[in-house]
Amino acid sequence: MAHGILCGKGSPPSPIDSPEEINPGQDVTFIRAITPELCIEAVTKLCRQILPRKLSIDPNQDVQVLAPLHRGIAGIGNLNDQIRDSLNPHGASHSMGSTLFREGDKVIQTRNNYDKDVFNGDMGIIDSVDSINGKIEILFEGKRIIYERMEIADLQPAYAISVHKSQGSEYPIVIFPLLKQHFMMLQRNLVYTGLTRAKKKVIFVGDPAAYSMAIRNDKTLVRQTDLVRKLTKTET
């Protein structure tokens, strides 16, 4: 399927109309949810109920939502808020500007911190929140890191992240919202990158027409190819 996407061929799997219909043995699934509101509802239901029940997985450890845009109802910001409220509604919390962090939240480091030995793209789980002193303690793989008040700005919620941020990483299960409202980002390489981040299963949630729009649009690939051609011409 990934090769077909690069070639601009292929259509999404036959869409299903409810997360309840998902087949645990199917590698690629498309759930029809053509409005942002329906998309958010389906994504949160997958994370909270369907996937843990049908696949016996931990949504924090095994599921990663990848989205094309930060803003909007089905954007990364609102996805993080809705998934957090669904999976982790009661943890002690601390706000940093407009960003809320709760005990039990999945978070991502957004820049390299050599002193703490954590790097851009590292993911962890908030183990404790000290809202009085403005400190957060995070469990990364094999290590526990304390963030002081000013260091918390280097963290972002990570229930949902951008497709761009996911490059170089892999996850057991990827959920990929894909809507016409994402039209500015609907490109072939976006779908290819999202699909190939999944080790076991990818679940598209959204409008099949948006998938088709993305597959037909290879503008980024064309620009990259043209750049290579120009650079090669300059060197000769």
Model regions: which residues?
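C-terminal accessory regions
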Residues: 1-2, 122-236
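Conserved helicase motor core of P-loop NTPases
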Residues: 1-107, 113-116
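Conserved flavin/dinucleotide-binding core of flavoenzymes
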Residues: 119
